[in-house]
Amino acid sequence: MARSPGDRCALLLLVQLLAVVCLDFGNGLHLEVFSPRNEGKPFPKHTHLVRQKRAWITAPVALREGEDLSRKNPIAKIHSDLAEEKGIKITYKYTGKGITEPPFGIFVFDRNTGELNITSILDREETPYFLLTGYALDSRGNNLEKPLELRIKVLDINDNEPVFTQEVFVGSIEELSAAHTLVMKITATDADDPETLNAKVSYRIVSQEPANSHMFYLNKDTGEIYTTSFTLDREEHSSYSLTVEARDGNGQITDKPVQQAQVQIRILDVNDNIPVVENKMYEGTVEENQVNVEVMRIKVTDADEVGSDNWLANFTFASGNEGGYFHIETDTQTNEGIVTLVKEVDYEEMKKLDLSIIVTNKAAFHKSILSKYKATPIPITVKVKNVVEGIHFKSSVVSFRASEAMDRSSLSRSIGNFQVFDEDTGQAAKVTYVKVQDTDNWVSVDSVTSEIKLVKIPDFESRYVQNGTYTAKVVAISKEHPQKTITGTIVITVEDVNDNCPVLVDSVRSVCEDEPYVNVTAEDLDGAQNSAPFSFSIIDQPPGTAQKWKITHQESTSVLLQQSERKRGRSEIPFLISDSQGFSCPERQVLQLTVCECLKGGGCVAAQYDNYVGLGPAAIALMILALLLLLLVPLLLLICHCGGGAKGFTPIPGTIEMLHPWNNEGAPPEDKVVPSLLVADHAESSAVRGGVGGAMLKEGMMKGSSSASVTKGQHELSEVDGRWEEHRSLLTAGATHHVRTAGTIAANEAVRTRATGSSRDMSGARGAVAVNEEFLRSYFTEKAASYNGEDDLHMAKDCLLVYSQEDTASLRGSVGCCSFIEGELDDLFLDDLGLKFKTLAEVCLGRKIDLDVDIEQRQKPVREASVSAASGSHYEQAVTSSESAYSSNTGFPAPKPLHEVHTEKVTQEIVTESSVSSRQSQKVVPPPDPVASGNIIVTETSYAKGSAVPPSTVLLAPRQPQSLIVTERVYAPTSTLVDQHYANEEKVLVTERVIQPNGGIPKPLEVTQHLKDAQYVMVRERESILAPSSGVQPTLAMPSVAAGGQNVTVTERILTPASTLQSSYQIPSETSITARNTVLSSVGSIGPLPNLDLEESDRPNSTITTSSTRVTKHSTMQHSYS
């Protein structure tokens, strides 16, 4: 049914009216806000409800901060219509800030009435807005109505003062800045509502330091600081300090406290000052030929900030340094200009250099002084100091050209020289030229003239030629002192000749049949002008080769080769290859090409299966022959004779045990048999005593060894088998002599000879077990000292005794109890040194050796009794030491008599002595009848002779039993026998032992002819005969030792000179070895020793071949004659 427009308007009005009625009288939760002005009367109900997004919300409630609002409670109330309509018990509840959220305790509400009360003073700066939610709940806590929101706004009051964000503000501005230039901005904040005037801040400058004039002003609203003028000068004031304050509102002065802050403004430096040089001109001095030396320093002052670019000076050369001799830089610490010589100057070329510099700053000048600055050069004069110069090359590199086509006749020609000149005179210097680098030895340089010649034809293709040049270096060494050197370089440019033809790089190739092309490459060792590009052509030999293969593409040094028909097999393709000059090799270049089937990703299949290796006929035949030889070896062993002695030399088992392996360079082999020589406990058991025949060696085991000792001054160095030993010698420089000794050394045996306390180890297989010399010396010294201490407890039996009628008592104990002389050392081990030594002796002699001969061989050391001094607390003794040893192949003349001796003060000295000349502060008495027993030790020695040798030479040959006569005489002159050279000295005791083989009678001792008849002389003589076990003749005439040989007389003498002998007496050296411990306490010299003319046997061509020693001790009491 259609309606008219009037009807539609009436219906719309009716709907609106119904809605208003529902709003006013329908069910719902209502909020009443009480107006503070109406004292508890609520606001009109409909003016505080606003429709928004289909929900009813209340308008905010405004409460002022800082006031007591408790008198205005309740400030709001919520109510539900269901309480009246249905009579339901309703409970009201609020949540939100101030109640259930911090800050707590601001609001409280009544659960029954829904009234909201305020309990605290509000602070907008703490909580500017409160949002509360109200609920209407039934008894079960369920919402009866939709929750209602309540907004409470806190109104601001001006209760806060402005506060600066910093206590100190820092800013900066360049000096000479224009007026009204912004310097910085300061900031202060106010906690009041920024949308009100309560938060407005006003700024003001309170004071300025320094306060000479106001340089800055402050915008009171924005806090910006500006300059007042352009007169800021850092050199005057480098910084300013401002005190500023901030106030509320427009800056009215009130009673409220005012916040202040400090502002520090630093004035930045600009380059508004020109650097000033200290002096107007400078002078310096440098030595020629020096480099990197400081010439001078130029000091500059600048008023700008120290250390900045505006202060640092910048130096530039205006003139005079076109040669680049000098360099100038700035010292950043002192702002000085350092002028340095960086290139050598020559006094002969320039004696003075004039320079000029300009000084600026590192930073550009400020615009305020650009018009004032004018560059002014600073003159500098540098004088060159002349020095004595060395040598130099005019050019350190000299170049020559040489062709590899030159002939050999041109090698002797000079290609140039490399002359060195004296830098002072400019003339050629006197130097020596030496090559230091000539890798392939191409050139020779004359050491005097520096002339350069080629010694080899240059080869361009040599691996030492780089880029067509060969380099050598020459050093010139000056002849003056100190020597100076200079190095020059010789560069030889080699001219290439087309003497090499292009050849194939790889003449044997294998390609797969599916490859369309074959790359063929050639090379030529000549230079670029005589090598590539190459020309390739295929030679049609055999005919048809050129049609089968063709060249499809050619590069400079290679071509691509293509086969007309794909066919497997091997082909030889001859090429004619020529270089850029048309030169080719006379022989054809043949490419051996194999076309084969290839696996995918692999090589030729045929090549992979051709690796089979099998045994050929020759290998099989060799294996069969080897088996036959193995079968033949047992048959050959049956033919060999077992157990038969070999003819000729007897094999020596275990040669490493007996013979020294001279072909080994290492240490001697380990000794496996410890010699019994070191087993004895006493001092005498560690050495073999002996003179000429002191070393008892087995027949056939002698090996001659020569040793020479040189005695000069007061030391003696002896070389024995390449080893030097030092011995003390009391000879003066005038009495220096050479004593040559020849000893006997057993091969591969260590024979230790104890000679006057010194120990010698002869090289041999037993050298590894030799005891240390220092250990032996210390051991025997302590041993002798212990026996010396024991002597005080025993009565002396074997020395000159001191009686009551003599002047002084003995200061030293007697050595009468010399039990250690008879030690456990037994030399019988030398009789049989074992089967190995016997076999070696048989090999060397070529005959059998019988060891059944019973030979007595003993040796006990002979010790000399020490005599106490007559007075004083020291024991004086003058000793002359010499030694004579003998070799089987070397003869030396006997030592000459000594005419002068010298004594020196030593302590605990161990010497080797042969002749002993002693001076003792004690009266010596002549001995009694020789028949009576006395303190006498007689050494009886027998010798057998061998081949003829010169006099004073003894050969220690194989031992033969024989008879000897030993004669011992003792002469003791009385105290009246005074010699003119020894008028102030004491007595002399002369002892002589004469040892003779059969056939020689000792001659009488001719000493009495030199003594005056009026003096008393006591002579004691004793003869003993030593004979082998077979017996000897009762007479002294015994048969000769060896047929056809001559007899040998060996005389051993011990002489003790004193003042009673005449100066004409000569004492020869005695050949003996004695162990003594000598202590000297005074230094003096005596005259020539007396010559007693004791006759020695001088029969030539005699040799001692066997020695036997027996030591017998006799006791004799000696008396004094008045």
UniProtKB/Swiss-Prot annotation:
One of its GO terms (molecular function) is cell adhesion molecule binding. Disulfide bonds: none annotated. Expressed in undifferentiated pluripotent stem cells, expression decreases during differentiation (at protein level). Expressed by embryonic stem cells, expression is reduced during differentiation (at protein level). Expressed at the apical-lateral cell membrane of kidney tubular epithelial cells (at protein level). Expressed in epidermis and heart (at protein level). Expressed in the brain, spleen, lung, liver skeletal muscle, kidney and testis. Residues 55-618 are extracellular. Disruption phenotype: Homozygous knockout mice are embryonically lethal and heterozygous mice also show reduced viability due to failure of implantation and arrest of embryonic stem cell population expansion. Loss of Dsp localization to cell borders in 3.5 dpc blastocysts and a decrease in Pkp2 expression in embryonic stem cells. Conditional knockout in kidney tubular epithelial cells results in an increase in injury markers, apoptosis and inflammatory infiltrates in response to induced-injury, ultimately leading to an increase in atrophic distal kidney tubules. Glycans are attached at residues 117, 314, 467, 519. The modification Phosphothreonine is found at residue 808. Induction: Induced by ischemic injury or kidney disease in kidney tubular epithelial cells. A component of desmosome cell-cell junctions which are required for positive regulation of cellular adhesion. Involved in the interaction of plaque proteins and intermediate filaments mediating cell-cell adhesion. Required for proliferation and viability of embryonic stem cells in the blastocyst, thereby crucial for progression of post-implantation embryonic development. Interacts with PKP2. Interacts with CTNNB1; the interaction promotes localization of CTNNB1 at cell junctions thus reducing its nuclear localization and subsequent transcription of CTNNB1/TCF-target genes. This is Desmoglein-2. The lineage of its organism: Eukaryota, Metazoa, Chordata, Craniata, Vertebrata. The gene is Dsg2.
